[in-house]
Amino acid sequence: FTIVLTDMNNFTERKPFVSYLSNNEIKFAEKFAARHDLEVIKPRNLRISKTHKQVIWASSESLLLQDLSIKNSKPFMIDYLSFKKIKAKSTLLKKCFSKKDSGRKVLDLTAGFCIDALEISYLGYLVTAIEKKSWLYEFTSYCLKNVKQKEIENSVNRIDFVNGDSLDLIDNYSDHEIIYLDQMFDHKTDARAKREIQFLRNLDFEEYDLTRLTKTLKNNNFKKIIYKSALHS
């Protein structure tokens, strides 16, 4: 069980385990875990873990996520077309973006799986999506590179996916007109959330530092800031 301490309110963050589906992939899993400061766990130990059972199955062929605490769960990667909102004509997110502004640059500060970034780029925007967690960045990069559906290939190509702290990097993107921020971890009890989103919510990431963001934005001239949050927040 791995815990990392953050500076914000003495927050403790839970990290996923790394494991393997075949003994032939042990070395690959170990290298993946070392790159991202994660803990490797044997499959049999994962199933009896008393802390949590969220895992990245790492192999030379694929990267898959699974939460074994959920009954009948299966390993998965991101199937972007299963998120119908990406191609939907009208969604709450799409209403925030005018078709007249298509082609402009958007800076997504909380990329995650790049699901919202892909929905925005599907409208024709150029999206720079920044993800802080290196393991999540590598997993999502793998999923984006393996998109086979022609109807969203162009949208994927309009995403510039970056690994780093968005608040450290924001000054590098002063040419972007729109800032997008999703506090996706606010609504943890939503049973309707897809397994992909629930996987991240169950890891109890630290909340985005809005105070630091406010100070940073004072030094920039972005034309629009779109902040997505649960209604109760």
Residue ranges and their predicted role:
Residues 176-181:
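Short SAM/SAH-binding signature in class I
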Residues 210-233:
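Conserved Class I SAM-dependent methyltransferase catalytic core
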Residues 5-104, 132-175:
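S-adenosyl-L-methionine
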Residues 113-125:
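Conserved SAM-binding loop of SAM-dependent methyltransferases across substrates and taxa
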Residues 126-131:
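Conserved SAM-binding motif I beta-strand of class I
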Residues 109:
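Conserved beta-strand/loop positions that form the S-adenosyl-L-methionine
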Residues 184-212:
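Mobile active-site "lid"/loop adjacent to the S-adenosyl-L-methionine
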